[in-house]
């Protein structure tokens, strides 16, 4: 007996629908929903997608990286929007960091200066190396810190850019069409998440305690047969922007909030 990516259990040429659960997660203006197979004894209160089996360590690492990137994108979407600032901070030759320990110390000292003066601010920071220069730099997304204070409290080099997050973000879908995802900052989150290197060790990013967690709803039983061609109904006020069956055996759907739909 085998369960395919389409969710059907096949035995001796007969196909029947496997038991499935679905779960929605709300993060800012984005709602994601997964539909996944479970065994007949699965407790709906604690169910989650089965972790796939991997042929190699590389496959396992890729899967874990995708899960980590998805959680990071949800964190960004849950806490930041058009009032937030995205800043890139570089170090002058005088203060240049040469080791991971040095850039961590610089990041943490700057973090303390910001949080001391703006304790209610939301902050996420990552550090990385420039592709051409190999020099350390810091990226930050913040909400509740004036733009001039970011540069004033940095003082170790330049603020290359400090700009507000976009109200409209466009992504290319599977048909090559540009789709307005609104305040969905997954692309920015993936860019920042990709700065981490194995030599850095530890966590990929640092987030302030003021950041809120995405809201995960309890799982419910999927009583209908869903597919990317026949997705679950969008939450009120949301529009479907992405639908796909993953290589890991579950379906993934993304919806973004559209204020115009609330007027209907």
Predicted feature residues:
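Right-hand nucleic-acid polymerase module
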Residues: 1-134, 144-264
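Calcium-binding loop positions in Ca2+-binding modules
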Residues: 137
